[in-house]
Amino acid sequence: MIVKICGLKKAVDVAAAVENGADMIGFVFAKSKRQVTVDEAHELAKNIPAGVKKVGVFVNPTEEELTAAIKGVPLDIVQLHGQEPAEQANRTDAEVIKAFPVKDGKLPDNINDYPNAYILLDAPAEEYEGGSGKTFDWDKIDRDLLTKNKLIIAGGLNAQNVQEAIKRFEPYAVDISSGVETNGEKDPQKIKCFIKTAKGVE
């Protein structure tokens, strides 16, 4: 199972994620309590080995903002959490994760407009997009409508429920942020526990 640890701001947290087998490291460039600058992410990325993908999280970015981060960090993947048009996703010089909020168990009508992107399902936004720590209603999702090799599950995951999410959705990857935090800060022990559980290692 591919595991993405998102919202990292400190070198010690990046190290904890990498050392315990994270496959993707997420840096949040959108307005958030986890927001970092391109320069900050660039410094953190120096400690990420080549086999671990660096992901930048954005909400309705300009082309210039995307390009600056892709080149400046550099990023392997951009994660789009706003109302970005499919045209923007399709011409981005990186792999793309397109995030969709799941409201009332319904998938958005435009979910198929991004054929080349990974599709991330998340709980509806609160003050900021993503990182709310809440799950969406897993029971109402028609899994037959989802392409599993492109599917990423997020929203309210933790070490206690991630295996159930994997069994239900058989996703390509799982994505976590607040579920590996204690008092609003990344917790290295929770990072370790989540990764080991998601990958099925005791």
UniProtKB/Swiss-Prot annotation:
It catalyses: N-(5-phospho-beta-D-ribosyl)anthranilate = 1-(2-carboxyphenylamino)-1-deoxy-D-ribulose 5-phosphate. Keywords: Amino-acid biosynthesis, Aromatic amino acid biosynthesis, Isomerase, Tryptophan biosynthesis. One of its GO terms (biological process) is L-tryptophan biosynthetic process. GO terms for molecular function: phosphoribosylanthranilate isomerase activity. Its EC number is 5.3.1.24. InterPro entries: Aldolase_TIM, PRAI_dom, RibuloseP-bd_barrel, TrpF_fam. This is N-(5'-phosphoribosyl)anthranilate isomerase. Pathway: Amino-acid biosynthesis; L-tryptophan biosynthesis; L-tryptophan from chorismate: step 3/5. It comes from Listeria monocytogenes serovar 1/2a (strain ATCC BAA-679 / EGD-e). Gene3D superfamilies: Aldolase class I. It is an enzyme of class 5 (isomerase).
